[in-house]
Amino acid sequence: MNKQIFVLYFNIFLIFLGIGLVIPVLPVYLKDLGLTGSDLGLLVAAFALSQMIISPFGGTLADKLGKKLIICIGLILFSVSEFMFAVGHNFSVLMLSRVIGGMSAGMVMPGVTGLIADISPSHQKAKNFGYMSAIINSGFILGPGIGGFMAEVSHRMPFYFAGALGILAFIMSIVLIHDPKKSTTSGFQKLEPQLLTKINWKVFITPVILTLVLSFGLSAFETLYSLYTADKVNYSPKDISIAITGGGIFGALFQIYFFDKFMKYFSELTFIAWSLLYSVVVLILLVFANGYWSIMLISFVVFIGFDMIRPAITNYFSNIAGERQGFAGGLNSTFTSMGNFIGPLIAGALFDVHIEAPIYMAIGVSLAGVVIVLIEKQHRAKLKEQNM
């Protein structure tokens, strides 16, 4: 494997490992500072909004100033963010930490993806991006597991460790990464407004609505999950880490071994509908579960439906996009970010009203998604009849 690509993969792994590390300790951390579910929602939303705003600028600066420089700046910001959260004793410091963290993600991700595109031969580009996705998932899966055990020593330790990982990634980037002589910068063209009139906007309405609605519901549930289990059955950081890591492993296994097989027998819309119904059933079981082991077992399988929906929607976008793959990818990313910003805000406020309220909201949103899919399938059937 190319040495630079290995370093880029390692950087991405460290960043997402660092993000995952802190998930199990958030409930203890927030209670220690006397913060609420609404506060957690604000912290998560601040990260998402900051990343959404900075990402376009991060990509542009990476093209103009060099991707290595932007990656290194992003890694330093990541470490600063984690250290600030580790020493923070009031909400203002934590909020500033999350804003800086979002900025770091908005710089590192465009820089890394752009550099991988620059240094990858055309026949290996898709494979290299596939590896990047798998490495991101690996960081998310291993992070909570490691963070939960670190929290047995101190609930601030995972934040210090994440910050140290950022510094390590920064040093490796300085020493081992080099900007290529030829980059993809010249491949970016100036937006021509007349091209927008050639796009069939109607075909994107359903996937855009689905993306917004589902990212809204899923982020609302996932944001509050650690706090939910801690309050409902008194899960410790170690328990939360086992639940989330187990759920991540099961979700990844289903993505790797079963997603392609399901796609051979179902259309994307049909598969999304069934995945949503599966999620509704599991979420209802979660509402009625009150024991340690029942919630642990549900935690292992609750994320499967969500993990299957995401690639199905991406695949659906891609299939209807035709030659507008970049445009479709941009729409998908934009409306996912919007849902990730709005969802935690509302879920946090609902959690303070009733512990089960965010779950009810996720159930309602999932059912709304099923209705949207059914309406779209019916509309497609009518169009097919008219064209016959």
UniProtKB/Swiss-Prot annotation:
It is a multi-pass membrane protein. PANTHER family: CHLORAMPHENICOL EFFLUX PUMP RV0191, PURINE EFFLUX PUMP PBUE. The chain crosses the membrane at residues 5-25, 42-62, 69-89, 99-119, 129-149, 157-177, 201-221, 239-259, 269-289, 293-313, 331-351, 355-375. InterPro entries: MFS (IPR011701), MFS_dom (IPR020846), MFS_Efflux_Transporters (IPR050189), MFS_trans_sf (IPR036259), Multidrug-R (IPR004734), Tet-R_TetA/multi-R_MdtG-like (IPR001958). Changing residue 352 to A: No quinolone resistance. It comes from the Bacteria. It is found in: Cell membrane. Involved in quinolone resistance. May constitute a membrane-associated active efflux pump of hydrophilic quinolones. The keyword S-adenosyl-L-methionine does not apply. This is Quinolone resistance protein NorA. One of its GO terms (cellular component) is plasma membrane. GO terms for molecular function: xenobiotic transmembrane transporter activity. Its main location: membrane. Gene3D superfamilies: MFS general substrate transporter like domains. Belongs to the major facilitator superfamily. TCR/Tet family. SUPFAM superfamilies: MFS general substrate transporter.
